[in-house]
């Protein structure tokens, strides 16, 4: 009986040691999630509440003392500086176009690009939005896309704002770099400052006197839209090239009264037939790499 007991105990100890060792094997160890709540947030991931320089606390005179009169003054000015309604910014990329010739004047939409713009216009009409402002890049392909969309939505063409800040370009050197697209540093400097100026012009929380939610439609370009998305969400702007959006797709961003930004659609083109889904220049007519 003693031998049997010793055998059982020895076998049990051996099995326990074996399984303990197996549990220590790196292949079977489960690490804590990198999103563990005890881990401090990296400084770069913190939200900048004054990203548009319109945070109310940054606009009013600071408290000079703790007297009731001064606190009342401060609170009244703070309330007066606060936005009350949200701003919705809907970005549409132009339709497919022909990259023929060196001048923008020859870069017209293809027949497929015109159909894409028509479907997008119908989709925007179905959403039932009452537009407060429509802005279009001054490049031909964006102008043609805008004209087609305007036939579908309730907005007067004469009120469209044509903005050169929205023209296509190289916003910032992408990370990771890509071998097939390497603009000169001077182009990033020239285009980047212009595109950033476009972002600051159109992306900000509502003015305090805005009494209802507003809707702005911007017809522009792939690089510009992707950069705007990264900047608005406070993602590293260098990551813009990792995003892909289709021709005539819809991207919808909302800026709340607090200044927080959320994205509703990113490159939405699911309302189009599959044969109209494109995101690059047609290869058979492309004259540049």
Swiss-Prot record:
Record flagged with keyword RNA-binding: no
GO biological process, one term: regulation of mitochondrion organization
Reaction catalysis annotation: O-phospho-L-seryl-[protein] + H2O = L-seryl-[protein] + phosphate; O-phospho-L-threonyl-[protein] + H2O = L-threonyl-[protein] + phosphate
Record keyword Iron-sulfur present: no
EC number of the protein: 3.1.3.16
Membrane topology summary: Single-pass membrane protein
Function: Displays phosphatase activity for serine/threonine residues, and dephosphorylates and activates Pk92B kinase. Has apparently no phosphoglycerate mutase activity.
GO molecular-function term, one example from the UniProt record: kinase binding
Assembly: Interacts with Pk92B/ASK1.
GO cellular component: membrane; mitochondrial outer membrane; mitochondrion
Protein name stated in the entry: Serine/threonine-protein phosphatase Pgam5, mitochondrial
Native species: Drosophila melanogaster (Fruit fly)
Principal cellular location given in the protein's record: mitochondrion
Keywords: Hydrolase, Membrane, Mitochondrion, Mitochondrion outer membrane, Transmembrane, Transmembrane helix
Transmembrane intervals: 7-23
Family of this protein: Belongs to the phosphoglycerate mutase family. BPG-dependent PGAM subfamily.
InterPro entries: His_Pase_superF_clade-1, His_PPase_superfam, Mito_Ser/Thr_phosphatase
Subcellular location(s) of the protein: Mitochondrion outer membrane
């Amino acid at each position: 009986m003693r031998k049997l007991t010793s055998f059982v105990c020895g076998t049990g100890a051996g099995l326990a040691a074996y399984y303990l060792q197996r549990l220590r094997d790196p292949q079977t160890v489960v690490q804590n999630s990198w999103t563990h709540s005890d881990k401090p947030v990296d400084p770069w991931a913190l939200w900048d509440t004054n990203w548009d320089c319109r945070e109310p606390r940054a606009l009013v005179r600071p408290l000079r003392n703790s007297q009731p009169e001064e606190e009342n003054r401060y609170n009244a000015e703070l309330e007066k500086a606060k936005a009350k309604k949200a701003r919705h910014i809907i970005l549409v990329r132009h339709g497919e176009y022909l990259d023929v010739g060196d001048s923008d004047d020859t870069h017209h939409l293809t027949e497929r690009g015109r159909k894409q713009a028509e479907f997008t216009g119908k989709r925007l009409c179905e959403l039932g939005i009452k537009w407060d402002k429509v802005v279009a890049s001054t490049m031909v392909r964006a102008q043609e896309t805008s004209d087609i969309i305007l036939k579908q939505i309730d907005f007067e063409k004469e009120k469209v704002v044509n903005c050169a800040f929205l023209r296509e370009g190289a916003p910032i050197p992408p990370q990771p770099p890509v071998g097939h697209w390497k603009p000169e540093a001077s182009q990033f400097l020239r285009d980047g400052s212009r595109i950033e100026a476009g972002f600051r012009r159109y992306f900000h929380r509502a003015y305090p006197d805005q009494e209802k939610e507003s809707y702005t439609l911007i017809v522009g370009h792939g690089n510009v839209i992707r950069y705007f998305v990264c900047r608005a969400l406070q993602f590293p702007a260098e990551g813009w090239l990792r995003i892909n959006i289709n021709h005539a797709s819809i991207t919808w961003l909302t800026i709340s009264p607090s200044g927080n930004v959320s994205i509703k659609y990113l490159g939405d083109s699911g309302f189009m037939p599959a044969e109209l889904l494109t995101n690059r220049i047609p290869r058979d007519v492309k004259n540049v790499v």
